[in-house]
Amino acid sequence: SCASNRPNRVHKQVMTQRTQVTLTFDQHEYKTNCMLKVWKNELIVLSVMPVMGIELFRLEATPDQVTIIDKLNRRYTIMTYEEINKLSPRRISYKMLQLLINKAEKEINFDLQAGTHTLQLKANMGQREYNNQKEPQMVNTNKYKQVSLREILPI
């Protein structure tokens, strides 16, 4: 039969949720539409799409690290949770992020102090959808230049 000729694809359940995010960084406020996807215990993706569904920024969190991709300027930065936790007294881990998302029904509020800078994130959560999808696709960073976090976020 035809079905026997197809390669086996592993499908996993992914939670998808549209969100409206307000990011306040040192008194400057930015509002944007985002798409949040969570593959349990594997990957959290936050796609920032402010205009017509075009992804300009992307945050990919795995259990080991966080990658911030600036697609507009073709650059990215990678940080371990240990490096992130050196910037702020608030401890952050993959499990904590996943728990925060799972428990949030309508809204997520998150404040982060990095030196003299304050970053506040407020996300209005839309309807959650659960679907089976193939393995998560991470951005191929070979197309981008690796830079420091300070080049992407001036902290």
Label each region the model flagged.
Residues 26-28, 43, 53, 66, ...:
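Generic "edge-of-domain/loop-turn" microfeature
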